[in-house]
Amino acid sequence: MSDIAERVKKIVAEQMGVDLDKVTDDAKFVEDLGADSLDNVELVMAFEEEFGCEIPDETAEKITSVSDAIKYIGENME
């Protein structure tokens, strides 16, 4: 597992209060992990802080799964 993927999964597990083993690449934040809109905002903020990148609102709305976050961060990390 890449360092980015590992860090994303750790953030998701911590923010969502779920076990790390439930945070799979294809886990969707809302459907699989029980996130609400506030959780999504907090996840994006945590990703921005951890990886030193800015995620525009229109892009953040499209990040709905762990794999979406890993892909975006991998392509846009400073």
Curated annotation (Swiss-Prot):
Protein location: Cytoplasm
Keywords: Cytoplasm, Fatty acid biosynthesis, Fatty acid metabolism, Lipid biosynthesis, Lipid metabolism, Phosphopantetheine, Phosphoprotein
GO MF annotation, one: acyl binding
Record GO biological process: lipid A biosynthetic process
Gene Ontology CC entries for this record: cytosol; membrane
Post-translational modification: 4'-phosphopantetheine is transferred from CoA to a specific serine of apo-ACP by AcpS. This modification is essential for activity because fatty acids are bound in thioester linkage to the sulfhydryl of the prosthetic group.
Gene: acpP
Pathway(s) this gene product operates in, as recorded in its UniProt entry: Lipid metabolism; fatty acid biosynthesis
Family affiliation: Belongs to the acyl carrier protein (ACP) family.
Protein's recorded name: Acyl carrier protein
Function, in words: Carrier of the growing fatty acid chain in fatty acid biosynthesis.
InterPro entries according to UniProt: ACP, ACP-like_sf, PP-bd_ACP
Stretches assigned to the Carrier domain: 2-77
Residue positions where O-(pantetheine 4'-phosphoryl)serine is found in the record: S37
